[in-house]
């Protein structure tokens, strides 16, 4: 006999997911409040019956579709069977989930079911946003009597293609526990609500790019012809056209409390731009991508500074990465450095075309300032102190630039199926005696940052116009989950 959780349309499935999730969250919050106020423990029998659990989303396909689509990078089945995952924050992910479900529902005739899972929601994820006020003395008791985050149950095995299919196949790369873990970390690291993140992401490794982004973003909000309606800033600042002296409101020190502060230029349709200052180093680059990936962004681009390795380069020239020498080491255990990281044609073309358009250099002239080639990413900020070994490795790789983040970001995009690209600006030439000094740095920054950032923004405009074509099949594994 059918119940209200089976044979659903995509819209019905989303409504049911939201209903079940809200039931569990409300029950967990009420139980925590009762424990804090009265010392009442949660009912163990009710917990066994699913009082605090995530909802589960399942999609089944019998393999009968005569001509399944083969050109899409997502929304495809590799074999018949039942695909399932747990879901958190279904209202936040509604547009994404609806798009994915519509593809398999209409193209494959898949059957959709929603029910309660067996995985409980950890209590820390429901406290934020509630009226609950806790102190440190309550933490031990809550951890003892309520569901908590168990790291053994959180991982990237599905995304890394390491899962072993049993009765059910994974429907998506990240289950609810992994998503909730990252959503909490994103707010902590960036200082902004996860609801404000936009699908087109720029990473930078210098604060001055932030200043330029904020200046340009404020001008866009005031422009009635611009699609951008608000700027969300690290530290909880929300800027609209009605905000008086917006740049002054943003210039306080609230963002300095956060390790990798973010700024979100928001559009009405949720297709805006997020800028994250990841500061310096591959560890930060890995960390932010680990967590940002659960939001399923459409693209992330590295727009930062690098050391130029070729004599023919000049300070202020651009480097478009076509390949990476991964000396960052932070991903070696999950993605060995001998695995090639392919460039994404759509992203490369957008960055190249954007450079031509913004710089105003026609045709072949752009090649005088734009060099394509291999970028080295190192985890050693003082690699210059091992000049002999470094120079030999650079020479063998034919590298044209060095930084500490780009290859990590590209490798994470490869792992998590997020289209990626790198356009760097040469700030010094350490192999050729042009090192970065304070006075030179200031003059360089003043002249280069605005143009470089505008190239990144223009590239996003071009990529946004690509739509679903932006997502590449070359990032799919052999047994890829159906959802993007």
Stretches with model-predicted labels:
Residues 1-299, 307-484:
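Accessory terminal and edge-of-domain segments that mediate assembly/interaction
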């Amino acid at each position: 006999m059918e119940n209200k959780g089976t044979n659903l349309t995509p819209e019905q499935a989303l409504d049911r997911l939201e209903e079940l999730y809200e039931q569990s969250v409300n029950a967990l919050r009420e139980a925590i409040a009762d424990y804090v106020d009265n010392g009442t423990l949660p009912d163990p029998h009710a917990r066994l019956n699913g009082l605090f659990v995530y909802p589960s989303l399942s999609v089944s396909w019998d393999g009968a579709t005569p001509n399944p689509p083969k050109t899409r990078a997502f929304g495809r089945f590799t074999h018949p069977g039942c695909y399932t995952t747990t879901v958190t924050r279904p209202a936040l992910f509604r547009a994404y989930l609806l798009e994915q479900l519509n593809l398999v529902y209409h193209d494959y005739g898949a059957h959709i079911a929603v029910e309660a899972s067996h995985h409980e929601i950890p209590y820390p994820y429901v406290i934020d946003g509630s009226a609950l006020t806790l102190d440190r003395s309550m933490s031990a008791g809550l951890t003892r009597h309520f569901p908590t985050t168990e790291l053994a149950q959180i991982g990237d095995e599905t995304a890394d293609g390491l899962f072993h299919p049993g009765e059910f196949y994974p429907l998506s790369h990240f289950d609810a526990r992994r998503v909730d873990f990252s959503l909490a970390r994103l707010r902590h690291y960036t200082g902004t609500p996860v609801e404000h993140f936009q699908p087109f992401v720029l990473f930078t490794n210098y604060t001055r790019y932030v200043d330029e982004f904020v200046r340009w973003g404020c001008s866009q909000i005031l422009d009635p012809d611009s699609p951008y309606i608000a700027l969300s800033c690290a530290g909880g600042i929300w800027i609209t056209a009605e905000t008086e002296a917006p740049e002054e409101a943003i210039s306080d020190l609230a963002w300095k409390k956060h390790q990798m502060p973010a700024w979100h230029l928001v559009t009405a349709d949720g297709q805006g731009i997020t800028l994250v200052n990841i500061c310096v180093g591959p560890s930060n680059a890995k960390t932010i991508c680990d967590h940002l990936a659960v939001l399923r962004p459409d693209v992330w681009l590295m727009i930062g500074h690098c050391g130029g390795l070729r004599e023919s380069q000049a300070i202020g020239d651009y480097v478009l990465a076509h390949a990476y020498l991964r000396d960052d080491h932070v991903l070696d255990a999950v993605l060995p450095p001998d695995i090639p990281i392919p460039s994404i044609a759509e992203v490369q073309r957008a960055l190249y075309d954007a450079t031509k358009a913004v710089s105003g250099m026609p045709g072949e002239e752009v090649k005088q300032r734009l060099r394509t080639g291999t970028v080295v990413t190192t985890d050693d900020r003082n690699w210059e102190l091992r000049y002999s070994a470094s120079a030999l490795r650079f020479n063998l790789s034919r590298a044209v630039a060095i930084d500490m983040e780009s290859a990590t970001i590209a490798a994470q995009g490869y792992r998590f199926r997020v289209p990626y690209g790198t356009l760097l600006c040469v700030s010094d030439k350490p192999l050729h005696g042009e090192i970065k000094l304070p006075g030179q740095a200031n003059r360089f920054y003043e002249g280069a940052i605005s143009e470089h950032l505008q190239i990144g923004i223009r590239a996003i405009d071009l990529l946004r116009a690509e739509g679903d074509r932006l997502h590449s099949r070359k990032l799919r594994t052999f047994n890829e989950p159906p959802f993007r």
